[in-house]
């Protein structure tokens, strides 16, 4: 896994103010994350902290600029839970993967954001946000055949979570 430098000043960043929730669902990939994560307890702490659209946008922009990847298009949906989200691959990534696999390129590729996208609820837990940022980092840094919820992704999830947690203490 390619390691990214994670040291950056917080100067000029406005304060992130999450609110706390007490209960969270069991996650689908919980066992893998728990067994591979370098700081599973940090992830669990982030799962109890919720932010709205403005803070989520600020966090995503900061993490992406810090790690040197493009900022994804953010799509907020009122009906999406704070615990669920989805990441769309960048358009060029889909085209490159299709070409490498000898597949026809779908006409639907043209609607994909060039930088990728993340779909979130109007409020989102910081663990969910870190989870999706982990996918976004994989899409921009790692080979296209990197498993969606494999060990490399858990490492990117941890990297994003470390930056997010650092913002809270800034």
Regions from the language model: what does each represent?
Residues 1-127, 136-170:
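Active-site-proximal or metal-binding-adjacent scaffold patches in catalytic folds
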Residues 132:
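Walker B catalytic acidic pair
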